[in-house]
Design a protein with these regions (language model features):
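A short, basic/flexible loop-to-alpha-helix module at the beginning of a structural domain
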Residues: 17-30
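Short hydrophobic core segments
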Residues: 127-136, 259
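Beta1-alpha1 glycine-rich phosphate/pyrophosphate-binding loop at the start
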Residues: 27-102, 187-229
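A conserved short coil-to-beta-strand element within the FAD-binding core of flavoproteins
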Residues: 106-114, 247-256
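N-terminal secretory signal peptides and thylakoid transit peptides that target proteins
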Residues: 1-17
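Conserved small/polar residues in nucleotide/adenosyl-binding loops
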Residues: 257-264
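Glycine-rich dinucleotide-binding loop and its adjacent helix/turn
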Residues: 135-210
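A glycine-rich helix N-cap at a beta->alpha junction
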Residues: 234-248
């Protein structure tokens, strides 16, 4: 299979939308419309390059509820104190000002493929000729009994960047001396398999400097994890005695329940 480059993808998109909207284009009155749902790395990049490489021939609208996007990549560097918070945040102003993308800050509620419309949380609709869906992931709060949107402010999952990573950093820095940091990584499959263990490593880095008698307990529902040998060798070398990884055979299985009290 031949690789599809960004430029050939945009050329294909331009050609296909032109065919779809041929009567409008032939009169010179209406540009074909591409709507992108989701302003993360994937959606924002798609919106930018469709607008840029079409040289304005395509009317591009990006629908994203948040006014700032905080990257998961580099968030560990913020967590460990190697970058400041603002450095992982990005606004959408550049897309509008430099690339002519229409940015709509609202929730996309539903898609009517027959009418070619996206319905927004406000009740308005946005029409399209071609639709790009890049909503990213979200947390299934009800998958853990007792967990909720409200609970995440006290027991951060930090699986999404931004405020969640900020809460996590503040809590780690304010742990009592000799306290215990506990993590329950998710079962497979999930996005970025090494992610929880990268977080553990950075938390250990903070504690080694700020709270060296603290302990980290990893209660894992898996018998093994991504890059396990490398992580455990690194933990033993840099944080000896601080991190305890428990597999199901050791801890007997995870009871998926959280107490309203964040430290019970």
């Amino acid at each position: 299979m031949n690789n599809l480059s960004r430029r050939s993808f945009v050329s294909f998109t331009l050609a296909s939308t032109s065919l779809l909207a041929m009567p409008a284009i032939s009169t010179g009155s209406v540009r074909p419309k591409v709507v992108v749902v989701g302003g993360g790395a994937g959606g924002a990049t798609a919106a930018r390059y469709i607008a840029k490489d079409s040289k304005g021939a395509i009317d591009v609208t990006l629908i994203e509820a948040s006014k700032h996007y905080y990257t998961c990549f580099y968030s560990n560097l913020y967590l460990g104190g190697f970058r400041d918070y603002d450095s992982i945040g990005h606004s959408y102003d550049n897309l509008s000002a430099n690339h002519g993308v229409n940015v709509v800050h609202d929730w996309a509620i539903s898609v009517d493929s027959s009418a070619r419309e996206v319905r927004l949380g406000s009740g308005a609709t946005v029409s399209y000729d071609r639709l790009v869906l890049s909503p990213g992931i979200d947390i299934k709060y009800d998958s853990i009994d007792g967990y909720s949107v409200e609970a995440q402010t006290k027991m951060p999952h930090a699986w999404k960047s931004g405020t969640q990573v900020k809460v996590l950093r503040d809590q780690v820095l304010n742990m009592p001396k000799g306290g215990t940091f506990a993590m329950v990584p998710p079962p497979n499959p999930y996005r970025c398999p090494p992610g929880p263990y990268e977080r553990i490593s950075m938390v250990a880095h903070i504690l080694k400097e700020k709270n060296p008698t603290a302990k980290i307990v990893v209660i894992d529902p898996k018998n093994k994890f991504s890059k396990q040998g490398l992580f455990m060798a690194g933990w033993e070398k840099h944080y000896p005695g601080m991190i305890e990884w428990l597999d199901p055979d050791t801890h007997g299985g995870c009871l998926l329940y959280t107490s309203p009290s964040p430290r019970d």
